[in-house]
Amino acid sequence: MIEEQLKVLKVMNEVTSRIDMNAFAQMVGLNPHQTIERMQELVNAGLVKKVGGGYGITEKGKAILQVFAPVPKDAAFHFYTAIGQPTGFSAESLKDFYEIVKRVAVESLEFHLYREDFENWMKAVFKDAALANELANLKASQLKGEDLRQGILKAIAAKFGF
C-alpha cells in the first residue's frame, strides 16, 4: 500500500493543472476507487489536503517525496570506517541512508559524523540545513557507539515522521 501512496504523491507533485479523478487514477495505475482510498489515507496522514473540489500536496507530502527520491549516482553517500576502508554500503536516498544507519558499523557513523560528512551531504545534496544542524548538534554532544546511531535515527525520524 505504501508504494501506491507514494505513486499518488509523485503524480500529484508532477501534475500542473486540474484533472478529473479518472484521468488521475489512470496516471497512477489504479482504479478510481483505489485512488480515492489512497487519497483519503494521504489526507489522514497530513500528506495531502483538500483544496476546493480537489486535492493538493502538503509540505509534509513534499518532504516525504524527498525522502524516497533517488539522488544521482555521483551524489550517493558511501559509508567508510576509515579513509580507504569502504563498508560496501551506499545511500542513494534519505530512506536508504536511514536504513543503512540502522545496520552499518558504529565505527563508520563515528568516522563520518566527526568529519562532518553527514551534515555536508545533507546540505549539498538535499539543501537541508535544518537536518544538517541536527547532525552537527550530535557531534557537539560527543555521542559515540549505539547512542550516536540512535541520535542520527531520531534526528531523521523527527524530521520526516518515520
Name every feature range the model reports, one short phrase each:
Residues M1-Q5, D20, G53-P72:
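Short, cationic-aromatic polyanion-contact patches
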Residues E3, G29-N44:
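Short amphipathic alpha-helical interaction segments
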Residues A136-F162:
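Long, highly charged low-complexity segments enriched in Glu/Asp and Lys/Arg with interspersed Ser/Thr
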Residues V43-G53:
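A short, conserved structural fragment
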Residues M1-V28:
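Short amphipathic alpha-helical interface segments
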Residues S108-S141:
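Amphipathic alpha-helical packing elements
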Residues E59-Q85, A105-E110:
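Short, amphipathic alpha-helical interaction segments positioned at domain boundaries
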